[in-house]
Amino acid sequence: MTPIQFTFSSAFLLGLSGLAFHRTHLLSALLCLEGMMLSLFIALSLWSLQLSSISFSSAPMLLLAFSACEASVGLALMVATARTHGSDHLQGLNLLQC
């Protein structure tokens, strides 16, 4: 494993562990998801540059578009829950009451 691969895999695992262990606020969960998507985007970009193939060059842009959609939906959900529940604590949310 090269140092660059180790860096991006550890950044992804750090975001995953942050998502798994620090789930108090919805904003912190969204930031962990964005960190994971950013590390995947950079790793996929470097991988497509190493392969020098035309078919893999559009994959990072597609991932970036999905990441932007995920961020906008996440922020819209956070605003909606903050308006209805008064905070963004994940423990206060119950799917049966929404």
From Swiss-Prot:
Membrane topology category: Multi-pass membrane protein
Catalysed reactions, semicolon-separated: a ubiquinone + NADH + 5 H(+)(in) = a ubiquinol + NAD(+) + 4 H(+)(out)
Entry's EC annotation: 7.1.1.2
Keywords: Electron transport, Membrane, Mitochondrion, NAD, Respiratory chain, Translocase, Transmembrane, Transmembrane helix, Transport, Ubiquinone
One of the GO biological process terms: ATP synthesis coupled electron transport
UniProt subcellular location: Mitochondrion membrane
Lineage top rank: taxon: Eukaryota
MF terms (GO), sorted A to Z: NADH dehydrogenase (ubiquinone) activity
InterPro entries attached to this UniProt entry: NADH_UbQ_OxRdtase_chain4L/K (IPR001133), NUOK/Mnh_C1-like (IPR039428)
Residue spans crossing the bilayer: 1-21, 26-46, 59-79
GO CC, any one term: respiratory chain complex I
PANTHER family recorded: NADH-UBIQUINONE OXIDOREDUCTASE CHAIN 4L, NADH-UBIQUINONE OXIDOREDUCTASE SUBUNIT ND4L
Protein family according to the UniProt entry: Belongs to the complex I subunit 4L family.
Name recorded for this polypeptide: NADH-ubiquinone oxidoreductase chain 4L
Organism expressing this protein natively: Tetraodon nigroviridis
Gene name of the encoded protein: MT-ND4L
